[in-house]
Swiss-Prot record:
One of its GO terms (molecular function) is identical protein binding. Interacts with splicing factor proteins SFRS3/SRP20, TRA2B/SFRS10, KHDRBS1/SAM68 and KHDRBS3. Transmembrane segments: none annotated. Residues 97-114, 149-159 have a biased composition (Low complexity). Residues 81-345, 452-496 are annotated as: Disordered. RNA-binding protein which may be involved in spermatogenesis. Required for sperm development, possibly by participating in pre-mRNA splicing in the testis. This is RNA-binding motif protein, Y chromosome, family 1 member F/J. The lineage of its organism: Eukaryota, Metazoa, Chordata, Craniata, Vertebrata. It comes from Homo sapiens. SMART domains: RRM (SM00360). Pfam families: RBM1CTR, RRM_1.
Length: 496
């Protein structure tokens, strides 16, 4: 039975609470055969005061409406009129009224009768008030009053339509909750874990790495005074050893720095007492600022290592390109102590370099950034052991100021094929010493008279040109000391 095709449905309102389906059928059955009597009940199965009666013949329904409208039934005046569908509904399926969006009238009808008939969705044809006190035949009002307590469960079981707006509202609430929680969860994911503070140790490890250039691409300006000073002066009795490439001043090879301060690139301060600094290999300490492009750096910016103390040897086993830093510096207005890489060593301070020691090799090998540790050691010692062009059986002896040291004997040992002990003075009258050897054992006593192994007899009578002279060194003095006599020779001062 299609509801749209069944116009014989009457709405009976204002019923007594005690009136039941049998009474209604007995009263209205006088006008014609009745196919369905539907008494609307609440949750407690009590009558809500209105019902729907469907006649088999629509003409009988019209006659019953005329006869029974306004009559009294069980002590109450009833209203009988043609039930019709709400104006907002269309088609065969009934939509729930707006006021009862969470409940289905069909479910309520089924709860009243136990079966759904053709009376679903029918509304009275006109509005009016009856004697039940506040009841209106407008089914928008009646449904809103009568169906709100009804559960949603019977609606879904009775085959009625699902709730129209309850689920979307729940979804909207869940979505709003998710929306409110989502950004919070995202904020928790993004900002929940505090960023780990870059500690000094981890920063130093990054700076010490040979594969990473540290802060090579950092364009920060105005760093602090001791920005790149990774290691403080070592404590007494502590020997620091480094297995890197030791390109100490390579940080300013592409620095493009202007107006540098007084002690900017002084990597090694005057050594402190009782320590030995050792560098084994290929560590590029200051390559971190190789592409820094930093201006106006502070006074002790790139002073990384406080050198060893008085009376102890500084040793470098590697490819130490000490002065590669000023190859591509493009620096303007350096201050008074800018290019002073090494402070004047104290007396009895022996600087030793067991390696390639190409001090001014910056013009030829300025771009060799990724030489491995094994490569540096293997290449350096292989070149010296095979008699390369840098130092061929070269042995020079000298002191810091042309005089033997006054303190106790300082024995220094090393092993290589060539020896060079030189005294270099910068333009400020300060000196630094380098002792480079490659192959066989030697030892130096307090007067710096060194004895070599007999595998490579020293040639004391001549002084071979040093690679620093070929590239331009900083006015060094190479002295050969035999007993107390010395002979000096000056190179050009084209470097500074």
């Amino acid at each position: 039975m299609v509801e749209a095709d069944h116009p014989g449905k009457l709405f009976i309102g204002g019923l007594n609470r005690e009136t039941n389906e049998k009474m209604l059928k007995a009263v209205f059955g006088k006008h014609g055969p009745i196919s369905e009597v539907l008494l609307i009940k609440d949750r407690t199965s009590k009558s809500r005061g209105f019902a729907f009666i469907t006649f088999e013949n629509p003409a009988d329904a019209k006659n019953a409406a005329k006869d029974m409208n306004g009559t009294s039934l069980h002590g109450k005046a009833i209203k009988v009129e043609q039930a019709k569908k709400p104006s907002f509904q269309s088609g065969g399926r009934r939509r729930p009224p707006a006021s009862s969006r969470n409940r289905s009238p069909s479910g309520s009808l089924r709860s009243a009768r136990g079966s759904s008939g053709g009376t679903r969705g029918w509304l009275p044809s006109h509005e009016g008030h009856l004697d039940d006190g506040g009841y209106t035949p407008d089914l928008k009002m009646s449904y809103s009053r009568g169906l709100i307590p009804v559960k949603r469960g019977p609606s879904s079981r009775s085959g009625g339509p699902p709730p129209k707006k309850s689920a979307p509202s729940a979804v909207a609430r869940s979505n709003s909750w998710m929306g409110s929680q989502g950004p919070m969860s995202q904020r928790r994911e993004n900002y929940g874990v505090p960023p780990r503070r870059a500690t000094i140790s981890s920063w130093r490890n990054d700076r010490m790495s040979t594969r990473h250039d540290g802060y090579a691409t950092n364009d920060g300006n105005h760093p602090s005074c001791q920005e790149t000073r990774d290691y403080a002066p070592p404590s007494r009795g502590y020997a620091y050893r480094d297995n890197g490439h030791s390109n100490r001043d390579e940080h300013s090879s592409r620095g493009y720095r202007n107006h540098r301060s007084s002690r900017e690139t002084r990597d090694y301060a005057p050594p402190s007492r009782g320590h030995a600094y050792r560098d084994y290999g290929h560590s590029r300490r200051d390559e971190s600022y190789s592409r820094g492009y930093r201006n106006h750096r502070s006074s002790r910016e790139t002073r990384e290592y406080a050198p060893p103390s008085r009376g102890h040897g500084y040793r470098d086993y590697g490819h130490s390109r000490r002065h590669e830093s000023y190859s591509r510096g493009y620096r303007n207005h350096p201050s008074s102590r800018e290019t002073r890489d090494y402070a004047p060593p104290h007396r009895d301070y022996a600087y030793r370099d067991y390696g390639h020691s190409s001090w001014d090799e910056h013009s030829s090998r300025g771009y060799s950034y990724h030489d491995g540790y094994g490569e540096a050691l293997g290449r350096d010692h292989s070149e010296h052991l095979s008699g390369s062009s840098y130092r061929d059986a070269l042995q020079r002896y000298g002191t810091s100021h042309g005089a033997p040291p006054a303190r106790g004997p300082r024995m220094s040992y090393g092993g290589s094929t060539c020896h060079a002990y030189s005294n270099t003075r910068d333009r400020y009258g300060r000196s630094w010493e380098s002792y480079s050897s490659c192959g066989d054992f030697h030892y130096c006593d307090r007067e710096h008279v060194c004895r070599k192994d007999q595998r490579n007899p020293p040639s004391l009578g001549r002084v071979l040109p040093d690679p620093r002279e070929a590239y331009g060194s900083s006015s060094y003095v190479a002295s050969i000391v035999d007993g107390g006599e010395s002979r000096s020779e000056k190179g050009d001062s084209s470097r500074y």
